[in-house]
Amino acid sequence: MRDLAALLLFLILAGSTWPVPWCPRARSSPAAERDGIPAIDSPRFLPAKAAGDLKPKDQVLGLRLNGQAKAYPIAILNWHEIVNDRFGDTPVAVTYCPLCGTGMAIRAEAGGQPLKFGVSGLLYNSDVLLYDRQGESLWSQIGRRAISGPHKGQRLEAIPLEHTTWADWRARRPDTLVLSRDTGQARDYDRNPYAGYDQERGLYFPVRFKAQGYHPKERVLGLESDGRFKAYPFAELAKTGGEVRDRTGNRSVAVRFDAEHGNARAADSNGEPLPGVVGFWFAWYAFHPDTLVYKAKPR
């Protein structure tokens, strides 16, 4: 069955605009099967004061949209990778790939049709490939683009999302809700199945372009503007006073960096948050080998 799945994916990608490397996850693992990693389709939330299992330094993805703020603990996302959610009338998918360290929020609709996503069990450049349950198109998380199926070539809209600590997010968004551990799945959310991975130089799966210059797991903030890409390595941001004025493409940006909480976020010249992605350097480079890289000026 897995060999058949691998052959099918080869045929899919052969007709797509994306070259290899693709691969299923470890073939001996249930994660290699579609929905072997179960997405959360009916998320439950708690008020911040009821989230007693979260410690101040725990990592979360924080999203504010349509007047609502929500936190998604990485400890839960490590086991599920996708939360199909809603903010008012807006369908949103919050996604996290532990292999790339990338958390992203997307408007979950294409062609006016709301979508719900699952974990395909397949990877491209070590990054999770999502599938939508309506038409079964395959979507790249980092690329936000459908590589096969009825929506092939379409791209999903990114929504600004923060990757920070629970203490930081709660301090700035005291009205936040928190994704509950009551997911309907039997998982040990106190155990990190990827413990130590973010410190290792090695990758579990192949990538098309191999990054140089920084540790492969160096965290970067990646921004896109007018089809151009720029990475802001945390190692460079740490050399600044915490705020950088820069340009990405034709856009002026302000990047704020908080070393204590490991948080980097960007805003435009009007102070409006910009969608970006925080993730491992190797992953950003694998998708954007032509990326520019911010270098801190000597102080």
PLM regions and their residue ranges:
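Mid-to-C-terminal functional-domain signal that highlights helix-capping/loop sites
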Residues: T17-R299
